[in-house]
């Protein structure tokens, strides 16, 4: 059963969706309009007091480093934003990135990877790996943690896969919230009990077409479902047990455990897709934030 705060948040979100003040990934909207709506809302989010935003650049990508007061020097976090792979940028990531920085006291990078439908697979994957390598070079010897939600969770997993496959230093840990790992249709997302009001199965298919049209959807970098998850770094996963993408998290957990890889995980009842990024907003997301901090501390 969800907390009272979670129920209130869900009611507010659903009311805003009905009135057209908040978007939903159901396949009914113009993707560019949807992007503009979401990014405008994200850019109005409150940022963490005491966090300084330092601009950076990785090739053609705008990037930003959220630096907290009394910043630690022993680790780096990379936050890869979600948004269905069609929206989000370094600036719109400030709300959650600065909260992560404030809570962990670790500097947090965010960056503007290329988005669909203008730039399809593998543009976002290539950009994330480019940014990851640039950050490793800037901070030699420091443990680097990848955190992302939804599409950003997918990209955090794939970035670790590319590091593994290319002999690049691996992340110290990967923290995917509500990841998507299949764009091929192999996983059944229409299970009984699916109560997801944010990302519907139809909306997911629509996003997949925008991102992967004309691509090999069984390429493991497009669908990590087709990777056996061997030699991956430790992971911490969190998701809503009734969301459309719940099965994706379940598959990751199963494969990591089969390979003997550390995998901390928890599913939550009656929440919503990618609720983890509400941070201090609900008891459920606050628990995930504390678990994230503990996971990072254990792997520095």
Task: Name each model feature, range by range.
Residues 16, 20-21, 25, 55-64, ...:
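Alpha/beta-hydrolase superfamily serine-hydrolase fold, recognizing
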Residues 1-69:
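A glycine/proline-hinged amphipathic helix-loop "lid/cap" segment
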């Amino acid at each position: 059963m969800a907390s009272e705060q979670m129920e209130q948040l869900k009611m507010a979100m659903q009311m805003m969706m009905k009135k057209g003040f908040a978007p939903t990934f159901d396949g009914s909207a113009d993707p560019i309009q949807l992007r503009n709506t979401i990014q405008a809302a994200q850019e109005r989010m409150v940022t963490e007091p005491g966090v300084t935003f330092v601009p950076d650049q990785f090739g053609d990508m705008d990037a930003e480093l959220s630096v907290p007061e009394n910043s630690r020097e022993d680790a780096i976090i990379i936050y890869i934003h979600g948004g269905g792979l069609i929206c989000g940028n370094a600036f719109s990531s400030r709300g959650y990135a600065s909260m992560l920085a404030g809570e962990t006291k670790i500097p947090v990078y965010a960056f503007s990877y290329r988005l669909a439908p203008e730039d399809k697979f593998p543009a976002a994957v290539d950009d994330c790996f480019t940014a990851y390598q640039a950050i490793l070079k800037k901070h030699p010897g420091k443990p680097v943690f990848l955190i992302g939600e939804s599409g950003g969770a997918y990209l955090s997993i794939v970035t670790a896969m590319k590091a593994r496959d290319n002999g690049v230093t691996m992340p110290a840990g990967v923290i995917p919230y509500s990841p998507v790992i299949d764009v091929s249709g192999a996983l059944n997302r229409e299970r009984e009990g699916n109560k997801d009001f944010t990302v519907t199965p139809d909306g997911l298919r629509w996003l997949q077409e925008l991102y992967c049209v004309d691509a090999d959807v069984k390429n493991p970098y497009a669908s990590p479902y087709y990777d056996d998850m061997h030699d991956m770094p430790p992971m911490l996963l969190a998701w809503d047990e009734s969301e459309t993408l719940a099965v994706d998290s379940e598959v990751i957990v199963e494969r990591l455990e089969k390979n003997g890889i550390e995998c901390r995980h928890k599913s939550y009842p009656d929440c919503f897709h990618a609720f983890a990024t509400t941070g201090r907003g609900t008891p459920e997301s606050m628990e995930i934030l504390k678990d994230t901090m503990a996971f990072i501390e254990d792997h520095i």
